[in-house]
From Swiss-Prot:
Matches recorded under PANTHER family: CALCYPHOSIN, CALCYPHOSINE LIKE
Keywords: Acetylation, Calcium, Disulfide bond, Metal-binding, Repeat
Tissues expressing this chain: Striated muscle and brain.
InterPro entries in UniProt: Ca-bind_SignalingProt, EF-hand-dom_pair, EF_hand_dom
SUPFAM superfamilies, sorted: EF-hand
Species classification: Eukaryota, Metazoa, Ecdysozoa, Arthropoda, Crustacea
Ligand binding (Ca(2+) 1): 84, 93
Function: Possibly acts as a regulatory protein and not as a calcium buffer or transport protein.
A GO term, aspect molecular function: calcium ion binding
Organism: Faxonius limosus (Spinycheek crayfish)
Record-annotated disulphide pairs: none
Superkingdom, taxonomy of origin: Eukaryota
Entry protein name: Crustacean calcium-binding protein 23
Amino acid sequence: SEAKLKEAAKETLKTTTDPLEKLRSHCLSQGYSGLLSLGRLFRRLDKDRSWTLSKEELSRGVGQFGLDLSDGDINKLFSSFEKDGQSGINYEEFLESLRPEMTEPRKKAVEAAFKHLDKTGDGVVGLEDIKGKYSAKTHPKVVKGEATEDEILKKFLNMFETNTSVDGKVTKKEFFDYYSGLSKAIDEDEYFVSMVNIMWXX
């Protein structure tokens, strides 16, 4: 469950000394959409659309995200992603390394769900398309009678509305950012894959 995911991440945050693991745990302690929020923050800091962040921007972004890292930790993070001849770090690569690993069957299920939504094949889907295809009937809270399908849909759309870099649109990377957080909370591949398939009526 999301609550267990948050708790486990908070515990890791207390014990780990690795700055990348600290940031990953901090993302997961925010729930399924933590990585999505961080991605949005980085994309907003990238005013000149260079897809890179300077050390100062990285430090500011991490601070705004609510994680207090030392200068030493920021330097370590930055230097591990810095490439020769680049003036900053590529934050898409950085976010990719923060994503909890997904197994092949899970990646394929998320990939297929996105393809199902992305009719034009341009790697971007509108929130209206998501609204028309998303099914919340197997959502744990709906199954337990704690929420209606409509409430879950609104919450799901709201999460993407507040965390995407382009208003009203969701990129493939943002879609994967969300599902990698959700995947971390589910042990069995089979359950995850069937849930994604039912969610998007695939």
